[in-house]
């Protein structure tokens, strides 16, 4: 149809409409509704676009508060106002058109009004997408969409290998395991049909393709009772959620009446005399686990406003029980199962240590297996272990005790608030939380081994399974065969022999017991210092394992200045027992090393340790606060006093001054008053790609940094939510980043990688080789998806069993955590990935973390336990990324703590890389001062809503701080695959332009037709 014919068609249709209008007022009234309907449609379209943007940008990657949405809208207000003005103009034009008596002019104005409203939507969406939300959309619509088939297969093989060696055999009475091939199994426990594959939050993974627990049993050749499976599935199909989106501690399990009404036990006995019982517990980001299943069943946590349910099964409510004990319904089920079946095997499917004393209270429980968060294919490994195809070689990464309500940290875990600080500017609820790390260095096994040695506890009455414990289907002998000692380094050769009948792997563990003076530097009697895992040893086969131990690695940190003027690492004179162990408690062989005189690693004595760039001295005295810490002095004489819960809820005055740093921040404390404004916006002709391999201190960096404008410096630092922004002056491409520690987990983009076993399972392998293999596999998946930054690994400490994200972290031990992290990080670094190891530091629980919880601890404990894995990763794996945490050291937010980030991390350890924040949101901005943070060593802000007003003061001090941050960011990127990233516009931009072009062309054609029609009719009327 030609333009003339199309114009004639439109004209004839208009004439027809005119004649219809003469038919009466009803038709005219309906026609007047048309522009209103169109206006409503335009508004709806604009709303849909807004909702879609919200879903894309805030689709679950981080916790989004209402205030974040308000803040994001505030950033878009100019674009929204412009769109609203055009929309209103369109409506006004429509109304004016309707009032015109000239039908020709009326038709023209109606079209103009409609076009204006369409343009309002188009312009608003475009100005928002290419303006304040450009970086977020670039993140949402980033990269490729698939992992290569080769890498998928490699990942699945690695995941299964990790589970093969991470699942831990706890009990095997009378060699009840492995089970005979083809054994019929009654699988009891609701968790058998809804097992725990992983955790919730940033460390979650996609388990939609996972092999179920029952799948794993079937693949291993077992036949299971389908009546039981159907019974549990019909009872409940989904596991209750524990995350920051909602908390339900219900432990699903049918009542005994329901079992009996369905004749479950009678029918099961007819099926088989063997029972497998599955006990599962879940956990996730945003909530610690319930220490009491309170009778007050429902309440709301103030921090995120989520609803908490202790149990929807009222008969399970028990204020004396925790979530990590058997529920009343589970006990009833076990009573019946152990009465009816002679061979009962238990699977513990929980990332947290549970109270398991009941395993020894039922005579018919012959075996027990610990299987924490096995991921996508890990339950296949469980089946293989039960059948004997795989010999278990996992070892515990936490101490399992009989009574979790008696652990030293129990009274100082949870939510405690200061009562005398009522003016927290910006805080919605005026709550200032705190937690006391009262146990000092005596965390996990270090307490139990030392307390037993000092006579405080009867070890066997308190500890059920030691740290490092794990059984095998075979037996091993291990002994120290040779030692070489030059006074600086000890070399041990350990011979391991398989003395059983089945091939297996063994983990020789070396702990040292240092000399201790009563009232002196605090020391534990057992400290893991090296370990290895053997190859698969056939029956009768031996392997010699060599270990090297540096003397300085046995030094303790003297934060109380007992032997050093300013605090230092001190290797005291005396005998050091170097113990070969099967776990933290059972010593197999010993070598004694003697140090003749104290070695004090400060500038006045030995100088710095060989691994340090600068001498370590006290920088965190204020973190100690007014807390009484557990001491070994007098055989733990202050045990009762130190482990009691807080009694003083008044906040120290000096702590108050620091806490609300947005109010108290003073740039003059950081800035040189005589500092000169750096050069910005220079034209030096350098590109980011030119900096690949250039040394951090090379003067060439100054030339590149001089090219950045102040606005670019601000955006590099401030706009860092799952990306690094493209920067035109240096040709820096857009860099994509993603979660998480267990799997590629991009809620923003909807891209999910292989669901590996959780980090706790990786650590439970005690295999550095497998940890490195995990790093390689997740690194390959990150590369396939186009991500350069990885928000992992998670390296916090299992301070106690109730911490919600223990699945996401490795262990209660800093050294073991460090070894796993080193292997993973070294592997991903080889692939050009920047790992943001997190959450730095003392973020060992979820309760109140988003309120900047004040964390009080000794500097000795901070250095020896909580900083240890980060230190190891920087020194041994050249880690070049850190994600700091939302909590505070003392009362100073980590992100604003220059003592830790600049002095210790960059100074002592020589770190040269990016330090980014955990999510910054509008709720917590009253203590997360980004102006101070960038001066204190934080380089990049994970802001839910970016605004450059954080650095409205463009003083020399501010620009210098932003320039330093840019240097850190760009240096890390120059040593990553970012140097090879495509520098053109993102693909989504071209798609957007194409859609815009189509809309504009269609509108233009419509305008041409409309104007031609108007002019033709006007001419016709004039001639008439």
Language-model segments: which ranges?
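Short beta-strand elements
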Residues: 586-609
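Glycoside hydrolase catalytic-domain context in secreted enzymes
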Residues: 1-579, 583-586, 606-1024
């Amino acid at each position: 149809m030609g333009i003339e014919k199309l114009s004639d068609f439109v004209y004839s249709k208009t004439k027809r409409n005119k004649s219809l209008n003469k038919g009466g007022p009803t038709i005219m009234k309906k026609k007047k509704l048309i522009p209103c309907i169109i206006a409503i449609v335009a508004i709806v379209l604009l709303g849909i676009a807004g909702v879609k943007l919200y879903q894309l940008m805030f689709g679950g990657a981080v916790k989004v508060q209402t205030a974040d949405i308000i803040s994001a809208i505030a950033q878009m207000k100019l674009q929204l106002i412009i769109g609203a003005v055009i929309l209103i103009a369109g409506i006004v034009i429509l109304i004016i058109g309707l009032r015109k008596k000239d039908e020709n002019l009326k038709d023209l104005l109606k079209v103009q009004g409609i076009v204006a409203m369409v343009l309002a939507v188009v312009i608003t969406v475009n100005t928002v997408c290419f303006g304040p939300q450009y970086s977020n959309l670039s993140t949402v619509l980033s990269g490729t969409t698939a992992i290569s088939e080769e890498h998928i297969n490699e990942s699945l093989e690695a995941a299964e290998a990790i589970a093969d060696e991470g699942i831990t055999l706890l009990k095997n009475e009378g060699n009840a395991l492995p089970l005979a091939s083809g054994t019929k199994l009654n699988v009891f426990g609701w968790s058998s049909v809804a097992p725990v594959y992983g955790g919730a939050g940033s460390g979650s993974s996609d388990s939609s393709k996972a092999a179920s627990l029952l799948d794993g049993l079937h693949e291993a050749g077992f036949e299971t009772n389908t009546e039981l499976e159907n019974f549990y599935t019909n009872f409940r199909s989904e596991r209750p959620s524990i995350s920051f989106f909602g908390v339900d501690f219900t432990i699903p399990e049918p009542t005994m009446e329901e079992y009996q009404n369905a004749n479950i036990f009678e029918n099961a006995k007819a099926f088989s005399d063997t029972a497998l019982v599955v006990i599962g517990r879940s956990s996730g980001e945003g909530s610690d686990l319930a220490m009491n299943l309170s009778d007050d069943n429902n309440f709301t946590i103030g921090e995120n406003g989520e609803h908490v349910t202790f149990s929807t099964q009222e008969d399970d409510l028990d204020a004396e029980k925790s979530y990590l004990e058997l529920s009343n319904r589970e006990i009833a089920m076990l009573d019946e199962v152990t009465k009816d079946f002679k061979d009962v095997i238990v699977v513990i499917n929980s990332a947290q240590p549970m109270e398991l004393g009941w395993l020894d209270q039922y005579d018919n429980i012959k075996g027990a297996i610990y299987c924490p968060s096995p991921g996508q294919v890990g339950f296949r490994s469980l089946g293989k272990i039960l059948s004997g195809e795989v010999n278990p070689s996992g070892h515990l990464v936490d101490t399992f005790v009989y009574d979790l309500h008696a652990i030293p940290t129990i009274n100082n875990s949870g939510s405690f608030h200061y009562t005398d600080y009522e003016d927290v500017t910006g805080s919605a609820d005026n709550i200032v939380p705190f937690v006391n790390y009262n146990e000092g260095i005596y965390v996990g096994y270090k307490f139990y081994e030392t307390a037993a040695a000092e006579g405080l506890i009867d070890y066997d009455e308190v500890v059920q399974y030691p740290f490092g414990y794990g059984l095998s289907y075979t037996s091993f002998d291990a002994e120290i065969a040779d030692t070489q000692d030059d006074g600086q380094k000890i070399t041990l050769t350990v011979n391991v022999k398989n003395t059983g009948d089945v091939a297996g792997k063994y983990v020789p563990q070396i702990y040292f017991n240092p000399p201790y003076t009563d009232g002196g530097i605090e020391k534990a009697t057992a400290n893991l210092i090296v370990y290895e895992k053997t190859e698969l040893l056939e029956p009768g086969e031996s392997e010699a394992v060599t270990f090297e131990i540096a003397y300085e690695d046995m030094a303790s940190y003297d934060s109380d200045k007992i032997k050093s003027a300013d605090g230092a690492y001190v290797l005291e004179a005396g005998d050091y027992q170097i113990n070969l162990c099967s776990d933290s408690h059972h010593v197999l062989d010993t070598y004694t090393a003697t140090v003749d005189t104290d070695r004090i690693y400060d500038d006045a004595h030995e100088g710095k340790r060989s691994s340090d760039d600068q001498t370590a001295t006290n920088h965190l005295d204020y973190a100690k606060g007014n807390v009484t810490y557990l001491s070994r002095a007098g055989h733990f004489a202050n045990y009762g006093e130190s482990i009691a819960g807080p009694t003083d809820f008044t906040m120290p005055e000096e702590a108050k001054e620091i806490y609300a740093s947005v109010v108290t921040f003073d740039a003059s404390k950081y800035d040189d008053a005589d500092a000169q404004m750096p050069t910005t916006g220079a034209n030096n002709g350098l590109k980011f790609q030119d900096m690949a391999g250039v040394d951090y201190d090379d003067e060439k960096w100054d030339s590149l940094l001089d090219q950045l404008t102040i606005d670019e410096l601000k955006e590099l630092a401030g706009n860092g939510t799952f990306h690094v922004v493209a920067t035109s002056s240096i040709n820096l491409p857009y860099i994509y980043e993603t979660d998480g520690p267990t799997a590629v987990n991009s809620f923003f983009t909807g891209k999910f990688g292989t669901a590996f076993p959780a980090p706790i399972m990786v650590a439970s392998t005690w295999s550095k080789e497998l940890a490195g293999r995990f790093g390689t596999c997740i690194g390959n998946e990150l590369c396939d998806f186009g991500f350069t930054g990885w928000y992992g690994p998670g390296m916090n400490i299992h301070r106690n069993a109730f911490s919600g994200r223990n699945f996401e972290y490795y262990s209660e031990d800093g050294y073991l955590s460090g070894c796993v992290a080193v292997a993973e990080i070294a592997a991903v670094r080889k692939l050009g990935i920047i790992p943001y190891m997190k959450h730095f530091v003392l973020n060992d629980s979820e309760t109140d973390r988003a309120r900047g919880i004040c964390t009080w601890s000794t500097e000795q404990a901070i250095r020896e336990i909580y900083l240890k894995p980060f230190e190891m990763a920087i020194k041994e794996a050249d880690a070049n990324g850190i994600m700091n945490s939302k909590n505070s050291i003392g009362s100073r937010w980590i992100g604003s703590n220059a003592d830790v980030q600049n002095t210790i991390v960059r100074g002592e350890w020589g770190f040269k890389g990016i330090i980014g924040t955990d999510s910054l949101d509008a709720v917590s901005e009253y203590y997360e001062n980004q102006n101070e943070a960038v001066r204190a060593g934080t380089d990049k802000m994970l802001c839910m809503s970016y605004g450059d007003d954080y650095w409205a003061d463009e003083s020399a001090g501010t620009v210098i701080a932003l320039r330093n941050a840019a240097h850190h960011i760009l240096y890390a990127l120059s040593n990553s695959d970012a140097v090879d990233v495509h520098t053109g516009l993102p693909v989504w931009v071209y798609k957007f332009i194409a859609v815009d072009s189509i809309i504009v062309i269609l509108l233009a054609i419509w305008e041409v037709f409309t104007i031609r029609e108007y002019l033709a009719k006007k001419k016709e009327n004039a001639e008439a």
